Amino acid sequence: LESQNIRDYTEQTHDKEDKSTEFDFHFTLNGKTYGLSAKRTVRERYKQFIKTSQMSQLDIMIDVTLGIDITEDKLKNIRQHGVYVFVADEVYNESPFMKKNEGIFPATQFTKETLSNLE
């Protein structure tokens, strides 16, 4: 976030409506609120991203992960609920599925411009 000049953020905060939901980062950009979860692996935690996207007052929910354990089924499920996914470039570049699906990005596209264009 700092590298993208996004300075108005909080680290490890809980959702105001659902205290069981924790964000690694929460920030506002161009009037939209973003919740970001950063995990090395997804495992079963992807279900938390879905719950968060449904329960919170966020405009945009983002999962940042290496992506080494993420499957097409998990990605489909995450994306069906409007959660955006950023994965390691190496993983993204090796996945035709990721490349052809909207809302899944390589980590190098985690930029202020990309974030501003998410809806």
From Swiss-Prot:
InterPro entries for the chain: EcoRII_C_sf
Designated name of the protein: Uncharacterized protein in DsaVM 5'region
Organism: Dactylococcopsis salina
Upper taxonomic lineage: Bacteria, Bacillati, Cyanobacteriota, Cyanophyceae, Synechococcales
